[in-house]
Regions:
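Mid-domain, small-residue-enriched loop/turn segments at the edges of structured enzyme/sensor domains
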Residues: 45-48, 143-198
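Conserved catalytic neighborhood of penicillin-recognizing serine enzymes
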Residues: 106-140, 179
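Short, conserved catalytic-motif segment at the N-terminal edge
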Residues: 44-69
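Active-site SXXK
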Residues: 58, 71-99, 269
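Short glycine/serine- and small hydrophobic-enriched flexible loop segments
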Residues: 82-90, 144, 191-198, 299
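Short, glycine/proline-biased beta-turn/loop segments that scaffold the active-site neighborhood
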Residues: 90-116
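Structured C-terminal helix/loop/strand segments within mature extracytoplasmic catalytic/sensor domains
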Residues: 2-42, 61, 196-230, 237-302
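A short glycine/serine-rich beta->alpha loop
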Residues: 63-71, 112, 116, 175-178, ...
Length: 302
């Protein structure tokens, strides 16, 4: 089970900022690299969206087409984790309750459970797999347990109008399926991570549990590639840097949202890019641009 107490303690410093070393007359210059990098992608035909807010002040630091709706791939699994955590808090089911994988849940790509022999796992372990490896099979089993309608209702109750988990995970999408696993606006996603970091989503325990699951995330290939953290072990503070994030990857889609705390400040952020993934150079340009966003965020929090 994820240690909720340690998760809470790691984020307590969000409420006690210190004067930043790199602040000047204004902070806009800290994101000049971001504007240039994402601008180049847009010039090449990609759709880009980005948002960042200061966790202590609520101040908007970055807003680039932050209200448009773009595909966000596996980021939508965050909404499922919120619903699962809320039900655990309400004791509608137990974290130790065992769920079986079935043939209709089967799906490939991301995740570990499809490669394991265990036919059944506890609810809390499945949520940890989703948080840690974006496990597709665990996602489908949890969705079967709670229902997509319940996830949608929870999403609406949070006031999210442009962000949604649309479907279960599929190896291929037909004409009768939702065209994307999830969609979202970066403004809403950065707000959501800010609210989670402040323990404001549903209640304190629910928020902390979700942050604990997400702290296991092993995908640091996008924005977080700039933070110098160990992808397999970064639940604690490393060089005064603490990260909790969720990523989404599909053909022509790269998206990331998260919360980052440094020695001086903390931010919630989200970046989405939809692009023509017609070759490795195009994909690498997107990843390099997202890394540039990460470098600007790192500069801001330290």
């Amino acid at each position: 089970m994820v240690d909720i107490t340690r998760t809470r303690e790691r984020w307590e410093k969000v409420r006690t900022p210190r004067a930043a070393r790199h602040s000047g007359a204004g902070d806009a210059e800290n994101f000049s690299g971001t504007f240039a990098a994402l601008g180049r992608l847009a010039y090449e035909g990609a759709q880009v969206s980005a948002s960042a807010v200061d966790l202590n002040t609520g101040r908007t630091l970055l807003a680039i087409d932050d209200r448009i709706v773009l595909p966000t791939a596996s980021i939508g699994k965050l909404l499922l984790l919120i619903e699962v955590s809320a039900r655990l808090t309400a004791r509608e089911f137990s974290g130790y309750g065992i769920l079986d994988k079935t043939a209709r849940d089967a799906v490939g790509d991301s995740g570990m459970w499809q490669h394991l022999q265990a036919p059944s796992l506890p609810v809390a372990d499945l949520a940890a797999l989703v948080g840690g490896t974006s496990d597709n099979l665990a996602t489908n089993v949890l969705l079967r347990q709670v229902g997509l309608d319940a996830v949608r209702a929870r999403t609406e109750s949070l006031g999210l109008a442009r962000t949604a988990l649309l479907d279960l995970v599929r190896d291929s999408r037909g004409p009768d399926d939702a065209p994307q696993l999830s969609v979202g606006s970066t403004a809403e996603l950065s707000w959501l991570f800010a609210a989670l970091a402040r323990n404001e989503i549903v209640d304190q325990l629910t928020s902390q549990r979700v942050m604990g699951w997400l702290s296991l995330n092993s995908d640091l290939s996008m924005v977080a590639s700039a933070f110098g953290l160990d992808p397999l072990s970064h639940r604690g503070v490393d060089h005064d840097t603490l990260l909790v994030n969720k990523t989404g990857t599909d053909r022509g889609v790269r998206a990331e949202a998260g919360a980052l705390r440094g020695s001086n400040r903390a931010v919630a952020y989200a970046v989405s890019v939809q692009f023509n993934d017609d070759g490795l150079p195009a994909r690498l340009r997107v990843l390099e641009a997202m890394r540039t966003v990460g470098l600007d965020l790192l500069e801001y929090v330290h």
